[in-house]
């Protein structure tokens, strides 16, 4: 099975949820490891190096936010947060500190499986073509984007982006100067279809994260601009240079 080599860490203090997810994800071909609290999650992560982390927000002692912050200090591993129904602040906070996506409890295991597949696909190190040559470096002023290695450099220093952040940047750069609506970004980067009712602030938070990492002045951006009433666009003219 194509998912066989992917290892997923499920972190939740509810044994029943860990059990259900371990069973379902194992059946469809993933290797699953679990942790029942935040401290254990960090220990398991550093030992097992999973491909993706499914992380509950509400846990005693070290909660999901704390775990996410610690993981982001050392890794760009994809993180999907499990948040409470109706707690919008949980979702936004999780995204702001580095989560790639979220699923609201109670959730359908099939929904989570779909989100895992989508996030892993977009976090894959093999570049998918979005109209940008995958055999070159894109130079944009002080930025260089290596589409082969999925790496970004600012003033010749590596900037660490998560897989979703890179995919979002790659999408915007692929049609520099053309605005993308939030709905189209959700569909292209996260795989959410139009009929899904998804909080578009997912896009806004990731844009803020990109600006914080790439712009000289994130509060007055000159790379990633807001297209009033539409969404976002990448402003600079780009030059393609072969590797």
UniProtKB/Swiss-Prot annotation:
UniProt-listed SMART domains: REC, Trans_reg_C
Where, per UniProt, does this protein localize? Plastid, Chloroplast
- As stated in the Swiss-Prot or TrEMBL entry, residues carrying the post-translational modification 4-aspartylphosphate are 56
What does the record give under GO molecular function?
phosphorelay response regulator activity; transcription cis-regulatory region binding
Q: Which UniProt keywords apply?
A: Chloroplast, DNA-binding, Phosphoprotein, Plastid, Transcription, Transcription regulation, Two-component regulatory system
| PROSITE patterns xref list | OMPR_PHOB, RESPONSE_REGULATORY
Annotated region of DNA binding: 76-94, 135-236
Q: What's a single GO BP term from this record?
A: regulation of DNA-templated transcription
Q: Which ranges carry the Response regulatory domain?
A: 7-120
Q: Which CDD domains match?
A: REC_OmpR, trans_reg_C
- What are the GO cellular component annotations? chloroplast; cytosol; protein-DNA complex
Q: Which domain of life is it from?
A: Eukaryota
Its chief place of residence is plastid
Instruction: Kindly give the InterPro entries that the UniProt entry links to this protein.
Output: CheY-like_superfamily, OmpR/PhoB-type_DNA-bd, Sig_transdc_resp-reg_C-effctor, Sig_transdc_resp-reg_receiver, WalR-like, WH-like_DNA-bd_sf
Q: What is the purpose of this protein?
A: Probable promoter-specific protein mediating the interaction between DNA and RNA polymerase.
| Name listed for the protein in its UniProt record | Probable transcriptional regulator ycf27
Which classification does the entry list for the species?
Eukaryota, Rhodophyta, Bangiophyceae, Bangiales, Bangiaceae
Could you tell me the gene encoding this protein? Answer: ycf27
